[in-house]
């Protein structure tokens, strides 16, 4: 779904994508901030956050309580250092990736303050140090604590380790405010990093990946002596709680820090124009290779503190500052091969195998190739990229590394007189299971259709199968599914949906008893078996949703169930629409295909996904095994209800006090109405409870009838 443009997402798809992004970004935040071992590049991480923000902007009603746009970093690692609550939150900065982004930032500052862009507002520009953010607190001039940023609100108490850094003073000069929090970046110099790695190699120990991770890991040592041996350094550039402000500008505050004995960056300067900021950005970029510390951009800040106060903050970042990121580092190497990886959603992703090359101090052997169009030299909108040059095995390629882990191939260097290899043929068969891999119109990604049988997708498919709106099997959460899937004992393993329903029988004939395994017990095992048995008969729409057919979400599953009424009829139609000729997507001339297209709300994309699924023999085998254990119940035929809301589209918003949101949907459908998650011109009625916000405002704007919850009950005759 991540390859679908935001504008094409349905509300259900957008909600699912926001949930996926929230989990993914939280996972990578924890790896980066709490465990110091990132899995993806900075650019890939930024792309996740930008997509999250774009979806939230397009679907503001779907913004989650746990949205990444509402938090910073990750909570500190547990059972290591005591937590410290920051007196003032340590927020992250928004990013700029182009000159235009910087001009937009400066323009937004002028617009917010209601001033014309006449260069009257000064900005500072300083290198963005690639280290670990730190807050150091002094009371009455004495260092009392040092804390990491953590999640921005709570960090880790690393005071003992901070005291070992020679560049951080233990006392402030006389005259300093009673309470001072100096903030900055702990880092390891490149020269010290190389010396440390040489020492580790000489001792036969594993060397470190880069200075940033090494500095973070060194600062989190439980033994302060280890930290002291690592020669960590510090740059001061910001502050937290201050009982008195010794200066009224950003530049003035940093100068005060210098006078107090803190190292400050000598490349920090003040400018009154965007052109000045951008010129300094390029100058720092030119000087970057000669610096003895890693930087990944330049930070711009409004210089006057009174203007910073007026500008204030967004939920997780200040309006008065932005980080202008540098482009990724690049190197030239040879493409030795292309492997295909299958993701948990069935997406086939090409991975380049490279002649080893050092990029930014790290040896790179693999790189992402994104998708088959990217290999062909075609961009996301069909435009030529790399001047239309395709990528072939044996080519000289430019590798770009935009962070700590995942590099990418950005260009091909054609050598005159050198014969190239054959154009790469992207596989149309899944390498993990042998099922067909199809690419839907308008999408960049080719996906495996083996759904229920593909080992690369199995865990995710089973999690979906047992989820709340599918089979809803209590006791089979994410951890339990992972446990059963990875179990090697045949009496315990669950690799397909049918395995869930044979678990009890397999256990009866096994010496390995589930109740004897840690995390389970006799009571919980009985409850699990009871929950499984309770789903041996299941509503047709839940059964269809549980199969995990692409594009058949909860709404479309209900549409199909209502149209076909029985599983036998649905399966017959799907199989009759399967093309007799291999390679065709669907038998578009068949009556079954035309009937499926005629189902209200089901278009060709959904119908083709259904036919692709049933066209795979592997899927049919798994379904046969499942149907031997489970009976999908026939859907009751819809009859005219005579209800005043029959055929209408209803939106529920705000807090409902007499029913849950699911009960409200069920009641509306029982009376022949359709429910929607957003208000549009097609909405007939809005039921608004306390706290109704944007949906209520939109309904009022469009002149749509709005009633409260009590009036709803009266309207449908269930008061």
UniProtKB/Swiss-Prot annotation:
GO terms for molecular function: DNA ligase (NAD+) activity; metal ion binding. Gene3D superfamilies: 5' to 3' exonuclease, C-terminal subdomain (1.10.150.20), 6.20.10.30, BRCT domain (3.40.50.10190), DNA ligase/mRNA capping enzyme (3.30.470.30), Helix hairpin bin (1.10.287.610), Nucleic acid-binding proteins (2.40.50.140). Its cofactor is Mg(2+); Mn(2+). It is an enzyme of class 6 (ligase). It catalyses: NAD(+) + (deoxyribonucleotide)n-3'-hydroxyl + 5'-phospho-(deoxyribonucleotide)m = (deoxyribonucleotide)n+m + AMP + beta-nicotinamide D-nucleotide. Zn(2+) binds at residues 430, 433, 448, 454. Residues 640-719 form the BRCT domain. GO terms for cellular component: cytosol. SUPFAM superfamilies: BRCT domain, DNA ligase/mRNA capping enzyme, catalytic domain, Nucleic acid-binding proteins, RuvA domain 2-like. InterPro entries: BRCT_dom (IPR001357), BRCT_dom_sf (IPR036420), DisA/LigA_HHH (IPR041663), DNA_ligase (IPR001679), DNA_ligase_AS (IPR018239), DNA_ligase_CS (IPR033136), DNAligase_adenylation (IPR013839), DNAligase_N (IPR013840). The active site is at 128 (n6-amp-lysine intermediate). Keywords: DNA damage, DNA repair, DNA replication, Ligase, Magnesium, Manganese, Metal-binding, NAD, Zinc. The keyword NAD applies. SMART domains: BRCT, LIGANc. NAD(+) binds at residues 42-46, 92-93, 126, 149, 185, 301, 325. Transmembrane segments: none annotated. GO terms for biological process: DNA repair; DNA replication. Belongs to the NAD-dependent DNA ligase family. LigA subfamily. PANTHER family: CHROMOSOME TRANSMISSION FIDELITY FACTOR 18, DNA LIGASE. DNA ligase that catalyzes the formation of phosphodiester linkages between 5'-phosphoryl and 3'-hydroxyl groups in double-stranded DNA using NAD as a coenzyme and as the energy source for the reaction. It is essential for DNA replication and repair of damaged DNA. This is DNA ligase. It comes from Brucella melitensis biotype 2 (strain ATCC 23457).
């Amino acid at each position: 779904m991540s390859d679908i443009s935001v504008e094409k997402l349905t509300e259900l798809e957008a909600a699912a994508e926001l949930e996926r992004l929230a989990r993914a970004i939280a996972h990578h935040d924890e790896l980066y901030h709490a465990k110091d071992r990132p899995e993806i590049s900075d650019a890939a991480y930024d792309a996740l956050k930008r997509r999250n923000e774009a979806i939230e902007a397009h679907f503001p009603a779907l913004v989650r309580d746990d949205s990444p746009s509402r938090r910073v970093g990750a909570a500190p690692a547990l059972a290591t250092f005591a937590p410290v609550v920051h007196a003032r939150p340590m927020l992250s900065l928004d990013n700029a990736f182009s000159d235009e982004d910087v001009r937009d930032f400066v323009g937004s500052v002028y617009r917010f303050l209601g001033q014309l862009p006449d260069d009257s507002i000064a900005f500072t520009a300083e290198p963005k140090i690639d280290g670990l953010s730190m807050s150091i607190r002094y009371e009455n001039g004495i260092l009392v604590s040092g804390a990491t940023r953590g999640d921005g609100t709570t960090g880790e108490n690393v005071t003992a380790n901070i005291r070992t850094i020679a560049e951080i003073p233990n006392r402030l000069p006389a005259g300093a405010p009673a309470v001072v929090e100096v903030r900055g970046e702990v880092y390891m110099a490149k020269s010290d990093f190389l010396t440390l790695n040489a020492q580790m190699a000489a001792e036969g120990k594993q060397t470190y990946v880069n200075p940033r991770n090494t500095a973070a890991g060194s600062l989190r040592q439980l033994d302060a002596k280890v930290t002291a041996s690592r020669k960590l350094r510090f740059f001061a550039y910001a502050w937290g709680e201050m009982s008195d402000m010794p200066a009224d500008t950003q530049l003035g505050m940093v100068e005060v820090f210098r006078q107090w004995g803190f190292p400050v960056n000598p490349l920090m300067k003040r400018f009154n124009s965007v052109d000045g900021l951008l010129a300094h950005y390029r100058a720092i970029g030119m000087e970057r290779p000669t610096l003895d510390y890693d930087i990944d951009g330049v930070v711009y800040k409004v210089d006057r503190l009174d203007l910073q106060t007026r500008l204030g903050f967004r939920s997780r970042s200040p309006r008065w500052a932005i980080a202008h990121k540098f482009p990724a580092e690049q190197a030239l190497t040879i493409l030795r091969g292309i492997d295909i990886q299958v993701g948990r959603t069935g997406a086939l992703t090409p991975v380049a195998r490279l002649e080893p090359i050092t990029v930014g101090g790290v040896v790179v052997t693999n790189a992402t190739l994104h998708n088959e169009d990217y290999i062909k030299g075609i961009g996301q909108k069909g435009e030529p990229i790399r001047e239309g040059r395709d990528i072939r095995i044996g080519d000289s390629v430019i590798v770009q590394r935009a962070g700590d882990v995942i590099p990418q191939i950005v260009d091909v260097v054609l050598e005159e007189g050198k014969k190239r290899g054959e154009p790469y043929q992207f596989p149309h068969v899944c390498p993990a299971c042998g099922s067909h891999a199809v690419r839907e119109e308008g999408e960049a990604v080719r996906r495996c259709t083996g759904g229920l049988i593909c080992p690369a997708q199995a865990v995710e498919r089973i999690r979906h199968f047992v989820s709340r709106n599918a089979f809803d099997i209590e006791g089979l959460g994410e951890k339990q599914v992972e446990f059963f899937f990875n179990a090697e004992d045949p009496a315990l393993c669950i690799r397909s949906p049918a395995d869930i329903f044979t678990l009890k029988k397999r256990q009866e004939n096994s010496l390995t008893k589930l109740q004897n395994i840690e995390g389970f017990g006799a009571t919980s095992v009985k409850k699990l078996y009871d929950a499984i048995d309770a789903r041996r008969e299941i509503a047709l729409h839940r059964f269809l949703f549980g199969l995990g057919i692409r594009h058949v979400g909860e709404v479309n599953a209900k549409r199909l169930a209502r149209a076909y009424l029985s599983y036998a009829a649905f399966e017959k139609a799907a199989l009759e629409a399967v093309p007799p000729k291999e390679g065709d997507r669907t038998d578009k001339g068949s009556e079954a295909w035309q009937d499926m297209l005629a189902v209200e709300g089901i278009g060709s994309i959904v119908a083709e996904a259904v036919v692709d699924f049933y066209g795979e023999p592997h899927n049919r085998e798994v379904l046969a095994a499942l149907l031997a254990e489970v009976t999908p119940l026939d859907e009751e035929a819809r009859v005219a209800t005579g209800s005043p809301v029959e055929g209408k589209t209803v939106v529920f918003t705000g807090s409902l006090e007499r029913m849950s949101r699911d009960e409200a949907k069920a009641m509306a459908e029982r009376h022949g109405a359709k429910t929607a998650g957003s208000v549009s011109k097609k909405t007939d009625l809005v039921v608004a409870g306390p706290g109704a916000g944007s949906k209520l405002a939109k309904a009022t704007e469009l002149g749509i009838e709005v009633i409260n919850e009590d009036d709803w009950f009266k309207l449908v005759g269930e008061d």
